[in-house]
A protein has these predicted regions:
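Conserved helicase/translocase motor-coupling segment
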Residues: 2-89, 94
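Generic structural motif recognizing short loop/turn segments at the entrances and edges of beta-strands
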Residues: 18-22, 119-122, 200
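Activity-critical C-terminal alpha-helical subdomain
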Residues: 55-173
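Generic hydrophobic secondary-structure signal
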Residues: 10, 53-54, 90, 97-102, ...
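Charged/polar, solvent-exposed surface patches and flexible loops
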Residues: 9, 35-39, 114-117, 134, ...
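Terminal low-complexity/disordered tails
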Residues: 150, 161-211
Length: 211
């Protein structure tokens, strides 16, 4: 939800919101990758038109270069499966036509290659290996408006950002039921400022837009 709001606010500032349909998966990144990615790579429309913007803490920095694969590696299902895990940070199953003798190896290899190509072309990450809640709390508005709460922590981190938001919600609304309202407000205020995070998200959006 927070990532969706950040991306939509930046799109709005760039006058590009009408070109995108931003959706978020409430199950989190791992569910998104393990459940939906196998479907994405089976449809040309999804492969060409669906892009993933994932929380920065999921970024693995894995570099996939198809040209550097040896013939042996290309035909090794265990190796290719491990490449997929190194890229995405999670195990993603290859769904193949089974039978008494199990799935077809060539089909499995093709799916792993599709996963890796999709990773290279269509998967993007929020900047600085940050989760969206951390990005929002690093805004000047948040630091000034909620200084007393934020200063209770030594630093804003991926580990404590959601708890800080919960504390702010309790201070503002008396409970944690309004975290989404708080996120929407913070995303709006954050988008009005200039920051390196915002600049990197603009670059990410432009890269997707050109595709």
């Amino acid at each position: 939800f927070a990532a969706k709001n950040i991306v939509e606010q930046v799109l709005g500032r760039m006058n590009k919101l009408q070109y995108f349909d931003v959706e978020f998966n409430p199950g989190g990144e791992k569910t998104l990758l393990t459940k939906y990615l196998p479907t994405f790579i089976t449809h040309d429309f999804f492969k060409q038109k669906v892009f993933l913007v994932i929380d920065g803490d999921m970024q693995t920095d894995y570099i996939y270069d198809e040209d550097k694969l040896t013939v042996t590696q290309e035909k090794d299902t265990v190796y290719m499966k491990e490449c997929v895990k190194k890229a995405y940070g999670v195990d993603i199953k290859a769904y193949v036509d089974g039978g008494k003798n199990g799935g077809r190896k060539d089909q499995e290899l093709k799916i792993y290659r599709e996963y890796l190509n999709y990773y290279q072309n269509s998967v993007f990450y929020l900047p600085n290996k940050s989760i969206p809640e951390k990005i929002l709390l690093e805004s000047q508005y948040a630091k000034e408006q909620y200084k007393d709460i934020i200063d209770l922590e030594k630093n804003i981190t991926n580990e404590n950002a959601k708890n800080i938001l919960a504390t702010i919600s309790e201070a503002d609304y008396g409970n944690t039921d309004h975290i989404n309202d708080l996120i929407q407000k913070l995303a709006y205020k954050w988008s009005m400022e200039e920051s390196s995070n915002k600049k990197m998200i603009e670059e990410l959006i432009n890269e997707i837009y050109k595709k």
